Amino acid sequence: MKYDALAIEGEVLDYWDNNSIYKKIKEKNYGKKKYYFLDGPPYTSGKIHIGQAWNKSMKDMVQRYKRMKGLDVWDRAGYDMHGLPTAHKVEAKFGIKSKDEIPNFGIDKFVDECRKLALENMEQMNADFKRLGVWMDFENA
């Protein structure tokens, strides 16, 4: 029998989701000694890359270890949504060559496009990190 990573990993992820395993682990350790994990956030200016996947997997490993030791792990996912990387993506999308062109485009419209891009990418990143098996509080990211 050949190992089929996609099939088996999908089954494991489905099992965790269908049986609320993350929630049960959080409830099991609730009120015990606290461990605060501050997620050094990726930018939401694009899709995840291998470095972010590796980084988040390593963080997940540390948090799982702390949970296995019985600690109540605070594990909210975080994202860096500050302006520059996102603004550059929006400028490229709309062909804006200079910051001086933004008022003509519309400042409110530009800010809305930046917000939309950041939130869309955050949602996709949440899904991608979950697909990697990362257990973090993505609901409150």
Model-based region annotation:
Residues 1-141:
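N-terminal, positively charged nucleic-acid-binding surface of large information/translation enzymes
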